């Protein structure tokens, strides 16, 4: 189950990977749409939304290839929870313009997040770095 809008709809600017995690936590604390298990998606989940046969527009008016059921005028990419092995300063992002995944430094602020949740029960996940850090405040 995907959130209908992405982080750009809320903030009106790009966010880094840590802010994406904080955004997710804040929605879970508020029980957004009645659920408290929202999370960043995997790369495969991000790919599952992409199709060249689908068309919508991002915040800049560029064509993105996701279903029109999702709110238009959002970001053109999404952070995933996938961290680069042996180089944890990078996380994987997925582009809804090109359909490509790529590594991006976690501090990059020209990014967005589309949150997802499982329809069934799942094991609680908390990234290792989160256990000893505070929430990022802008």
Language-model features and meaning:
Residues 21-37, 43-93:
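An exposed tryptophan-centered "aromatic clamp" motif
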Residues 1, 74, 96-99:
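Short, solvent-exposed coil/turn segments at beta-strand boundaries
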Residues 82-137:
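Solvent-exposed, polar surface segments
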Residues 2-4, 65, 103:
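A sequence-level detector of short linear motifs
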Residues 1-38, 112-116, 123-138:
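Extracellular adhesion/carbohydrate-recognition regions
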